[in-house]
Amino acid sequence: ASTSNYCNQMMKSRNLTQNRCKPVNTFVHESLADVQAVCSQKNVACKNGQTNCYQSYSTMSITDCRETGSSKYPN
């Protein structure tokens, strides 16, 4: 339940409930410097076949917020 509350709060506070709902929104719980540092690390193929993804050398804390069957725009 706490992840659900976090997702609802973050989606509203960042105005991510405008126009349409994306199936997944990912929030990274790391410093901006740590996130930016990933871009200078190993370039790898993305899951969708594109080549503009990067592999972090360290584990990062994230929260994936997924649209549920009961999700309703704009909430």
From Swiss-Prot:
Residues involved in substrate binding: 22-26, 47, 66
Any single GO BP term: defense response to Gram-positive bacterium
Residues modified by glycosylation: 15
PROSITE patterns: RNASE_PANCREATIC
GO MF annotation list: lyase activity; nucleic acid binding; ribonuclease A activity
Keyword tags: Disulfide bond, Endonuclease, Glycoprotein, Hydrolase, Lyase, Nuclease, Secreted
SMART domains associated with the record: RNAse_Pc
Tissue and organ expression note: Pancreas.
Pfam families per UniProt: RnaseA
Reactions it catalyzes: an [RNA] containing cytidine + H2O = an [RNA]-3'-cytidine-3'-phosphate + a 5'-hydroxy-ribonucleotide-3'-[RNA]; an [RNA] containing uridine + H2O = an [RNA]-3'-uridine-3'-phosphate + a 5'-hydroxy-ribonucleotide-3'-[RNA]
Enzyme Commission number(s) of this protein: 4.6.1.18
Cysteines joined through disulfide linkages: 7-65, 46-53
Assigned GO CC terms: extracellular region
Family (UniProt): Belongs to the pancreatic ribonuclease family.
Protein name (Swiss-Prot/TrEMBL): Ribonuclease pancreatic
Gene of this entry: rnase1
